[in-house]
Regions:
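ATP-binding/phosphotransfer module of carbohydrate and carboxylate kinases, centering on a glycine-rich
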Residues: 1-66, 74-78, 96-104, 118-133, ...
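General beta-strand structural signal in soluble alpha/beta enzymes
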Residues: 106-111
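Short acidic loop-to-helix transition motifs that present clustered carboxylates
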Residues: 113-117
């Protein structure tokens, strides 16, 4: 891993955030910049905002790759889905779009995958050498799987069918808010979700991210699982940090899964 700060950018449905990351420390090297996501979040419009963020940090970063997260399945630089962003992203050559717009190397990754990498490299699962499964509970459910520190990308475990339903329509944090559930009422939905995921993968550790992770003490002790489960440590910094780490790792280890 290089010593110069690396730029990580996190594209979300409402905001696009970027920060320089110190990969030796596993944290931001300078304050984060946030720009609202364009109301029409097409690839061209989003790339323009990303270019603004890059310009802001250009004189403080090296000439290495930029890591960018996006709420989509990403295979070989192509976005295969689109969650909370314009549907024109589906099957778009997104990594090339960003690289062409910025005039530099870009590594594009799924947002939950980036967060999971950050938690294993620097956060709640730091240096864990087993099977770590991270879920982010938000508008939907994102997921990341890492085995011995290596990412297995695009797991999309929010879309498991459980009891006839797409899992995230029953257990995402947005459902708790929509239905006005207390944590005591919500925990049963989480129990069902995690016990199914546990039976499929038998991970060594669950890490839970998303806004509800700050209230982990209100629901985690009530979950009856065989797998240890812990809240994420990096919170809303994880995506940016993970993107920066993956950008450098992709250059150093091009054989990793894409």
């Amino acid at each position: 891993m290089q010593n110069q700060p690396v730029l990580g950018i996190d594209i979300g449905g409402s905001g696009i955030k970027g920060a320089l990351v110190d990969l030796a420390a596993g944290d931001f090297a300078a304050p984060r910049l946030r720009i609202p996501t364009p109301s029409k979040s097409t690839p061209a419009n989003v790339a323009d905002v990303v270019a603004e963020i890059v310009a802001e940090f250009a004189d403080k970063m090296g000439d290495g790759p930029i890591g960018i997260t996006i709420p989509a399945v990403v295979t070989h630089g192509i976005t295969r889905s689109a969650a909370n962003i314009d549907k024109s992203w589906i099957d778009a050559p997104a990594e090339k779009i960003f690289s062409d717009r910025l005039g530099r190397s870009v590594v594009l990754v799924n947002d939950a995958d980036a967060a999971g990498v950050a938690e294993v490299k620097f956060g709640a699962a730091r240096d864990h050498q087993g099977l770590v499964l991270m879920t982010t509970l938000g508008t939907g459910i994102g997921s990341a799987i890492l085995y011995r520190g290596v990412l297995i990308p695009n797991s999309e475990l929010g879309h498991l069918e459980i009891d006839g339903h797409d899992a995230e329509t029953q257990a995402a944090a947005s459902i708790k808010t929509l239905l006005g559930l207390s944590y005591s009422e919500y925990v049963g939905r989480l129990q069902r979700y995690y016990e199914v995921v546990e039976a499929l993968f038998w991970p060594d550790l669950f890490v839970v991210g998303g806004g509800v992770s700050k209230d982990a003490d209100k629901f985690m002790p009530k979950l009856k699982l065989k797998t240890p489960i812990v809240p994420a440590a990096l919170r809303n910094r994880a995506g940016i940090i993970g993107a920066a780490w993956l950008a450098v790792d992709k250059v150093e280890h091009p054989e990793r899964p894409a």
